[in-house]
Structures are given as C-alpha cells and as structure tokens.
Design a protein with these regions (language model features):
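Beta1/beta-strand and adjacent pyrophosphate-binding region of the FAD-binding site
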Residues: 1-15
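Glycine-rich flavin
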Residues: 2-5, 22-28, 33-167
Length: 167
C-alpha cells in the first residue's frame, strides 16, 4: 500500500474490534493488524472460557442446597474434570469463531503480523511500510510467569494453558 490510510489499528482483540466498528462507520481507508491468533483474548483464553468454567464450578457447588428442595443423593455427585474442560473448549471455540467473523470480510485490510512503529504516522509489518493519519494501538496483554515461580516444581497454569488441560 503506497497511499496514506485514514487509520491503522494494531491489535484485533476486544479493544481493536471496538475500534474497528467505529472506524468502519467513518471510513473504508483502514487496515487492522494482528500478531498471533485471530479471535480476542477474552473469547480465546480470558473472560468467556473462564466464565464457562466458573459456571460448572457453581453448578457443582449448588449440590449442597439440593436437600432444601427435597432432592436427595447430592453427596454421591462427582465432577468429571475432562468433560468439564471439553465443554469449556467447545464453548470457547464457538466464542472465537464469532469474533473472527468480524474480520473475515476484510480481505487484505486484515493483516497477520507484528507491527513495528517507525514514527507517529508510519509502521512496518511483514516488510511492508504503511502510513496513516491515525494509528490506534490496542495490543492487549499476555500472561507472564515470574522466573522464580518456575522452580516451585508444580505446573503453573496461565490463561494461555489452563483451558487446554485434559484433567
């Protein structure tokens, strides 16, 4: 692209997609750049799958109230962690698919790659220089495990690894 775009959005997470919705109302002269998998952190490894896991935990916890309703046998209920995690992953995949649909029709205006700012109105991605009147930085977050924790001897789960566990 040799022309100066109206907007470049760096990041296709929740904030980047919110920016995209607003930008599309005003101009078609834009690109959105995403480094990593498309689909928001919220949908892929954050808010949405964690709420599905919490929902299962709450459902299991409520077994303690069954006797109030005349329901007997709650003491013999068990949780099937692999089944719970399979459900969480299935729901998560649906959540991600719905967020990815937001960018499917963008064609070459959706770029996979890591953006490197070169100035207030320029950046480089995949060896290509792009210029824009406005650059929105919405790069999101990623988990960090402090190095001393790696010596604790137990697996440390982050949002990037928790939902991939089998049991």
């Amino acid at each position: 692209m040799s022309e100066t775009l109206d907007v470049i959005i760096i990041g296709a997470g929740s904030a980047g997609l919110a920016a995209l919705r607003e930008v599309r109302k005003r101009t078609q002269s834009f690109v959105i750049i995403n480094d990593g998998p498309w689909g928001t952190i919220c949908a892929r490894v954050g808010c949405m799958p964690s709420k599905a896991l919490i929902e299962a935990a709450n459902a299991f916890h409520h077994r303690n109230t069954f006797t109030e309703f005349g329901i007997r046998g709650a003491d013999s209920l068990t949780s099937d962690i692999p089944a719970i995690l399979r459900r969480v992953r299935r729901l998560r995949n649906d959540f991600v698919a719905s967020t990815v649909k937001t960018t499917e029709d963008l064609g070459d205006r959706a770029i996979s790659g890591r953006a490197h700012l070169l100035g207030p109105d320029r950046l480089e991605v995949n060896g290509q220089i792009l210029c824009a009147r406005n650059i929105i930085i919405a790069t999101g977050s990623s988990p960090i495990v402090p190095k001393p924790w790696n010596t604790l001897g137990k697996p440390i789960f982050t949002t990037d690894t928790l939902f991939e566990q089998e049991n």
